[in-house]
Every structure is written in C-alpha cells, then in structure tokens.
Amino acid sequence: MNWQTWRHITKLDPDKVITKEEIAEIAASETDALMLSGTLDVTPENLAELYDNVRDAGLPLTVEPADPSCARFEGIDYVFVPSVFNAGHPAFITGLHKEWAQHADILWDKVVQEAYVVLNPNSSVGKLTRAKCDLTPAEVAAYGIVAEKYYSMPVLYIEYSGMYGDPAVTRAVSEALSTTRVFYGGGINSGAKAAEMGQYADTIVVGNAVYEAGPAVLKETVKAVK
C-alpha cells in the first residue's frame, strides 16, 4: 500500500453520524482511502466507534489526530499527523508533538507528517490554532518550500476547512514543490470543484460534502480526479 498514489481521500468525523448504508456507498465510490479526523469533540471512544463501523469497508484506513489522545495505531494503515505551520499557538506546531513523543509508544513506520496551512479563519481548526489566514499564494508556497526543503515533510496540506479555497494558492504551492505531496481540503462539493483543485493538488480530501450532500456527490468528486 502506497499512500502517495492516492488521488482522493474521504474524511469522516468521529463526532458526526453516518449510517451503515452511507458507509457502503462510500466504499463503492472508488475513493482511495478513509481518513478518520475531526477538530472538536473527538475522543478515543467515538473514534473507536467510527473505526468499528468502517473497518470492513475494504478501504485503507487512516487517522488524523487533533491531539495525542486520538493517535490510534491499532487497525490503522497510516497516522497522518498535522503540524500547523501558520498557527498562532506553538502547541499546534510542535508542542503537542513533543508531548506525544515523550509519553506515547509511537509506531513511526505508520506516521506521515503533514505540514498544514489553515486558511479559513472562521473554521474550528482556524480558531483553535489561532491560524494566521490572510496569506498570499506566494506566502503559502513559501511554507511549502520550508516543509519540503527544510523539514523534508512528505505532505503540505492546504486546509480551507468547509470553505472552497483559491485555486491560485493550490497552483502556487504545486509549482513550488517537487517531492512533497500537495493535499487540498475544503468546500469540495461537486465534480467541477474537485477537478479544479485536482489539476494542482496531488490529493483532494472531501469531508463535509459526505454529510451535507451525500455519497452520490462524493462519487462525483471521485470521478472528477480519477
């Protein structure tokens, strides 16, 4: 299994309700993987419940923990760990990571480091991390260069979190990087938007559309990039 070949990831929130029928439709959508991830009210308990519901979906399973308590390895193929480069609070850059490294038994061969740039100031993640979101495409691309050239991080994640972003940002980041993979997430709720961001991003991540528009729209976004 090679996550670097994935073009489409479906993000599911442990704090949101999803039915078995919807999970079956997601599994049939040809999305490349499931990412279990949320910003608020995610606990080891509701993460475990969501895992139990999707474990037999036949798709690669990943977790993107908001804090160390939800960094689950059992039954998980990869743990994508975000470091919010434009956070206003150092805990979300390296602080929580230090606590995790100090106190947890980490299976490092399953860890994928993500350099996050959060660009929606009204989102939960934007507020929680106090992210500086008024960045130009060139500034976001510069974060990407730091991630790739200085930290050798495998992922630069452009996160608009519920809001459709500026394709110029994704394009600028894509053109600036050569080895780091570009992930884009935020506001993709149609095939047209998936195609627009997918021409620049290596991987698009679709989350809210699953809950707001249903698996049929998810399938449309998959077809647009694969």
Curated annotation (Swiss-Prot):
Its main location: cytoplasm. GO terms for cellular component: cytoplasm. Disulfide bonds: none annotated. Keywords: Cytoplasm, Lipid biosynthesis, Lipid metabolism, Magnesium, Metal-binding, Phospholipid biosynthesis, Phospholipid metabolism, Transferase. Its cofactor is Mg(2+). Its EC number is 2.5.1.41. Gene3D superfamilies: FMN-linked oxidoreductases (3.20.20.390). Pfam families: PcrB. GO terms for biological process: glycerophospholipid biosynthetic process. It catalyses: sn-glycerol 1-phosphate + (2E,6E,10E)-geranylgeranyl diphosphate = sn-3-O-(geranylgeranyl)glycerol 1-phosphate + diphosphate. It is an enzyme of class 2 (transferase). InterPro entries: GGGP/HepGP_synthase_I, GGGP/HepGP_synthase_sf, GGGP_HepGP_synthase, GGGP_synthase_archaea. One of its GO terms (molecular function) is magnesium ion binding. Mg(2+) binds at residues 13, 39. Sn-glycerol 1-phosphate binds at residues 11, 157-162, 187, 207-208. Pathway: Membrane lipid metabolism; glycerophospholipid metabolism. It is found in: Cytoplasm. Prenyltransferase that catalyzes the transfer of the geranylgeranyl moiety of geranylgeranyl diphosphate (GGPP) to the C3 hydroxyl of sn-glycerol-1-phosphate (G1P). This reaction is the first ether-bond-formation step in the biosynthesis of archaeal membrane lipids. Belongs to the GGGP/HepGP synthase family. Group I subfamily. This is Geranylgeranylglyceryl phosphate synthase. It comes from Methanocorpusculum labreanum (strain ATCC 43576 / DSM 4855 / Z). The lineage of its organism: Archaea, Methanobacteriati, Methanobacteriota, Stenosarchaea group, Methanomicrobia.
